[in-house]
UniProtKB/Swiss-Prot annotation:
It comes from the Bacteria. The active site is at E134. This is Peptide deformylase-like. One of its GO terms (biological process) is co-translational protein modification. CDD domains: Pep_deformylase (cd00487). Belongs to the polypeptide deformylase family. PANTHER family: PEPTIDE DEFORMYLASE. Pfam families: Pep_deformylase (PF01327). One of its GO terms (molecular function) is peptide deformylase activity. HAMAP family: Pep_deformylase (MF_00163). Coiled coil: none annotated. It comes from Rhizobium meliloti (strain 1021).
Length: 172
């Protein structure tokens, strides 16, 4: 297991659709383990292979440390509720920035396990938000595209300011 470097916004890899996974082997398990380590180190509660520059349809989500991380291979939303709610979102690829995003409150997702078993399950609350956010990422939709133009521009400016402060501590 290893912490991998995270691709930062505005890399074009973050707006590129990931490829379906067809091989379920030790390499996939290793990638999943590395994603868990990288997500926790970021820190974050969700990450995709795209975030580390690997364009494969794998996401790891950990909304509750008690239940641990979950891996979703080739996830797809097959149903979503018409009821929506606003939630604060951000990205490990755009640290220092968070905004309110409106999403359906419940979703049903079809996915495969690390062993290749196909499953379908319904999620609500934070897990539903995370699944939608990470599946968007796998589809090449970076989260700020869900914002209004004005909010998106402000988010980018905040990120640029965060990057300057990170590169040159003590400056603004």
């Amino acid at each position: 297991m290893a912490v991998r470097p995270i691709i930062r916004f505005p890399s074009p890899l973050l707006t590129t659709s990931a490829e379906r996974i067809g091989r379920f082997d030790g390499t996939l398990r290793q990638l999943s383990d590395d994603l868990v380590d990288t997500m926790r180190a970021a820190p974050g509660i969700g990450i995709t292979a795209s975030h580390i520059g690997i364009l494969q349809r794998l996401t790891v989500i950990e909304v509750d440390p008690q239940t641990g991380p979950r891996s979703f291979v080739n996830p797809e939303i097959v149903w979503q509720s018409s009821e929506t709610a606003w939630h604060t979102e951000g990205s490990v690829s755009m640290p220092g920035v968070a905004e309110e995003v409106e999403r359906p409150v419940r979703v049903r997702v079809s996915f495969q396990t690390l062993d290749g078993e196909t499953r379908e399950e319904e999620a609500e609350g934070l897990m539903a938000v995370c699944l939608q956010h990470e599946i968007d990422q796998l589809n090449g939709i970076f989260w700020i595209r869900r914002l209004s133009r004005l909010k998106r521009e402000r988010a980018v400016k905040r990120f640029e300011k965060f990057n300057r402060a990170e590169a040159f501590p003590g400056t603004q």
